[in-house]
């Protein structure tokens, strides 16, 4: 019966929300800094025979043959953190302010189904989950390597996943995000996080976590990166750069991403330092990992799965590990994105830092990131006034989840 239900769900999903076809097969695909050249459909001897009747491939066949297999393998190895249910309750804050900050649906669910606290983040945790996905894939690059694919280094993979288990003791659990959000960002349990609060929580939790050690540089809700401030965060006692996650909270327009920033936004996912983008959908956050032409590929956290136990030894079952990945492609046109987002880059050493700055400065179009020697530099350079007209600093008062 269960198998029949799953089959029915897949059939309904196919017609209601079909997977995208590669309708720009001549364009390369990028996934977190890796380029996948256009794939060539298999040759058909009948196509060279004028006497043979023409055959039109069906949608399923076209979809199977036109996405590069290497890209599908890479996409399917990106860690996907979604809504979870039945985890250890997150206590509710019983104040009028906390209650009013929740949506009606979350308020009713918490009162009727979770009177002792939140045992699921469905309806309010998608920005946290997108931020967790960005951070988890940052650790994947650091600990497993950018060339890692599923089926390799299973023990190390499991230990990485355990850090994001839905339990108060896990270093990067939703429980700890919510606690830090309440302490440092004024976010109540059950309240939507925005990119700014999520970035701040990532920074605080990374600072408190000794293994693996990761430094985090925040731009404090602007698109400006200051080299002296970055050095203060990234340099060790010997003056060498340690692995540092740069988180840029920005707004690239008013209601939609301004076309002048399309090139810069696409390019951000082609840099080898890219670890993705969190946010970017009206009233819903996603985790963007790839780009092709004017479309971005993303992982959608709006699927509720059973919570995983915290196992520091990393002994997870295959089924539990599988719940952190998906092979289902999703994409969106840049014009349909929400302009508020959190953009992440991982700089591992001096060469990475020099290469990243060079790429930022040479990207065509209106820049989405500005690099300056110092915050106290009196003149931010030509074009700064125009940039301020379009790129707005994030304000949690109008952030989306």
Curated annotation (Swiss-Prot):
SUPFAM superfamilies: Cysteine proteinases. This is Probable cysteine protease atg4. Residues 45-65 have a biased composition (Polar residues). Keywords: Autophagy, Cytoplasm, Hydrolase, Nucleus, Protease, Protein transport, Thiol protease, Transport. Cysteine protease that plays a key role in cytoplasm to vacuole transport (Cvt) and autophagy by mediating both proteolytic activation and delipidation of ATG8. Required for selective autophagic degradation of the nucleus (nucleophagy) as well as for mitophagy which contributes to regulate mitochondrial quantity and quality by eliminating the mitochondria to a basal level to fulfill cellular energy requirements and preventing excess ROS production. The protease activity is required for proteolytic activation of ATG8: cleaves the C-terminal amino acid of ATG8 to reveal a C-terminal glycine. Its main location: cytoplasm. Residues 37-65 are annotated as: Disordered. InterPro entries: Papain-like_cys_pep_sf (IPR038765), Peptidase_C54 (IPR005078), Peptidase_C54_cat (IPR046792). The active site is at residues 126, 300, 302. One of its GO terms (cellular component) is nucleus. It holds the Pfam family Peptidase_C54. It is found in: Cytoplasm; Nucleus; Preautophagosomal structure. Belongs to the peptidase C54 family. It catalyses: [protein]-C-terminal L-amino acid-glycyl-phosphatidylethanolamide + H2O = [protein]-C-terminal L-amino acid-glycine + a 1,2-diacyl-sn-glycero-3-phosphoethanolamine. One of its GO terms (biological process) is protein transport. GO terms for molecular function: cysteine-type endopeptidase activity; protein-phosphatidylethanolamide deconjugating activity. Its EC number is 3.4.22.-.
